[in-house]
């Protein structure tokens, strides 16, 4: 029987971000995105003989299928920590882009690399921002998905990234006209719960890779979310999901709100900023997306009143109160139609305000190329060039964390999880010039004699075997230089 204590208030989590990529040149050689991506990763390949590596902050950096650089955060166990490491990925990716520009300039190829933290390119291809949450093995994933699905489908209302939807004239099945959508990802999922990730993207992926004790835990892989730019949007996306997971684990009385058609509903919600479209539930009743979110929010507010404070690390009740405050303000804004209380915190609201302003000033239609440019450049991660960056630097977008904390996360792994141990190994290996083989759980030194450590507990930041492995590398440092 579930109790309040059954909820994981300290939970391992992470975010994987795929970046869109293009190269804008002058009158020199035109380079394809895949060529630019390889140029970005060239120094990594030259050093490590691979484009798929773990880096000293404990995170994973790799070149995904096609031309999408991807960054997966190290294991984090509290909300602000996760935001710091997610944003650190933007810094790391942009530094790689700058290095690529400088390398190309030496070959008389002038131009700028653009990395976009969005989810849809100009021809309708989608790439992801995936969330990972460690959950107990005791609850079957399909049962968990059934309880979680109504929240995830309607969550776009409170934290979507927003975009202008342009109908594809080549798609004969296209049924939606030109319009503003609150989510970028909603049109690109096709199932509720499935093991697929690309061919038939689900809302929740069931691939069983816990990267922990598989008898105790599983990894909930959510692939429906948008890539967010504003820190408060990330906080609300992840923080609200943490609260819902905790309520499900504690059997806190969250009602069943199963939708009759998940995929039709997610697309309809994306095109209704009022959240007022009636959705059919499996029990024969109807509710709006806003009403579903309000029900979940009311339960989350009551949950926080008795939520156990995490004992070691984890997301504190104080921080969860910040999440609830923003969640409540956002729901009130949707209900009233007055978004002035959240128009510096929620991406789709910020972007829609910008687009509406351009429309009014220039008497533009929604299909005007200038608006498509605004839509895209909001997601440019280059400081001082991207529209989001400019707005944030002017104080027009609120912060959840600080630049100092983000920059610290660029070089140093989280100190409360297994990532701390991985970071120590990688920093020692880098300093000593030791070739190591690393993944989420296994860490191996290949010579002079193979030595390996398996870190099965993602919650543990202390391990004597890691101390011994680093000592082994130090003792044999000379042999690596010969």
Curated annotation (Swiss-Prot):
This is Pup--protein ligase. Disulfide bonds: none annotated. Interacts with the C-terminal half of the prokaryotic ubiquitin-like protein Pup. It is an enzyme of class 6 (ligase). Its EC number is 6.3.1.19. Changing residue 221 to A: Abolishes pupylation. GO terms for molecular function: ATP binding; ligase activity, forming carbon-nitrogen bonds; magnesium ion binding; ubiquitin-like protein transferase activity. Pathway: Protein degradation; proteasomal Pup-dependent pathway; Protein modification; protein pupylation. Catalyzes the covalent attachment of the prokaryotic ubiquitin-like protein modifier Pup to the proteasomal substrate proteins, thereby targeting them for proteasomal degradation. This tagging system is termed pupylation. The ligation reaction involves the side-chain carboxylate of the C-terminal glutamate of Pup and the side-chain amino group of a substrate lysine. It comes from Corynebacterium glutamicum (strain ATCC 13032 / DSM 20300 / JCM 1318 / BCRC 11384 / CCUG 27702 / LMG 3730 / NBRC 12168 / NCIMB 10025 / NRRL B-2784 / 534). The keyword Ligase applies. Pfam families: Pup_ligase (PF03136). Mg(2+) binds at residues 16, 62, 70. It catalyses: ATP + [prokaryotic ubiquitin-like protein]-L-glutamate + [protein]-L-lysine = ADP + phosphate + N(6)-([prokaryotic ubiquitin-like protein]-gamma-L-glutamyl)-[protein]-L-lysine.
């Amino acid at each position: 029987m579930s109790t309040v204590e059954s909820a994981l208030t300290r939970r391992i989590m992470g975010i994987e971000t795929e970046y869109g990529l293009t190269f804008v040149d002058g009158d020199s050689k035109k380079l394809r995105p895949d060529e630019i991506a390889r140029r970005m990763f060239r120094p990594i390949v030259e050093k490590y003989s691979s484009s798929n590596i773990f880096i000293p902050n404990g995170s994973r950096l790799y070149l995904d299928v096609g031309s999408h650089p991807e960054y997966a955060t190290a294991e984090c166990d509290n909300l602000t920590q996760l935001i710091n490491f997610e944003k650190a990925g933007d810094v790391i990716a942009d530094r790689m882009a700058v290095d690529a520009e400088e390398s190309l300039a030496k070959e008389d190829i002038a131009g700028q690399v653009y990395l976009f933290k969005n989810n849809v390119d100009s021809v309708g291809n989608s790439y992801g921002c995936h969330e990972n949450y460690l959950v107990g093995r005791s609850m079957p994933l399909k049962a968990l998905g059934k309880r979680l699905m109504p929240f995830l489908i309607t969550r776009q209302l409170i934290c979507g990234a927003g975009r202008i939807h342009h109908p594809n004239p080549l798609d004969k099945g296209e049924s939606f006209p030109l319009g503003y959508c609150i989510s970028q990802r909603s049109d690109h999922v096709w199932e509720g719960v499935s093991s697929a990730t690309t061919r038939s993207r689900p809302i929740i992926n069931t691939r069983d890779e816990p990267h922990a004790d598989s008898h105790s835990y599983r990894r909930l892989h959510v692939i429906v979310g948008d890539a967010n730019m504003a820190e408060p949007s990330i906080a609300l996306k992840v923080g609200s999901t943490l609260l819902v997971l905790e309520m499900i684990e504690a059997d806190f009385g969250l009602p069943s709100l199963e939708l009759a058609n998940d995929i039709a509903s997610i697309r309809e919600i994306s095109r209704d900023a009022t959240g007022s479209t009636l959705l059919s539930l499996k029990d024969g009743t109807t509710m709006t997306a806003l009403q579903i979110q309000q029900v979940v929010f009311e339960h989350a507010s009551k949950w926080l009143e008795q939520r156990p404070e995490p004992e070691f690390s984890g997301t504190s009740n104080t921080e969860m109160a910040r999440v609830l405050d923003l969640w409540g303000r956002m729901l009130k804004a949707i209900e009233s139609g007055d978004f002035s209380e959240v128009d510096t915190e929620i991406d789709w609201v910020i972007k829609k305000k910008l687009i509406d302003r351009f429309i009014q000033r220039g008497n533009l239609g929604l299909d005007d190329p200038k608006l498509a440019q605004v839509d895209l450049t909001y997601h440019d991660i280059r400081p001082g060039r991207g529209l989001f960056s400019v707005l944030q630097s002017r104080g027009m977008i609120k912060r959840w964390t600080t630049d100092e904390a983000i920059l610290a996360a660029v070089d140093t792994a989280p100190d409360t999880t297994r990532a701390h141990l991985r970071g120590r190994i990688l920093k020692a290996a880098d300093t000593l010039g030791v070739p190591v083989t690393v993944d989420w759980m296994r860490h191996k030194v290949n010579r002079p004699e193979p030595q390996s450590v398996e870190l099965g507990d993602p919650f543990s930041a202390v391990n004597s075997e890691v101390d011994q492995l680093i000592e082994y590398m130090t003792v044999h440092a000379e042999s690596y230089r010969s």
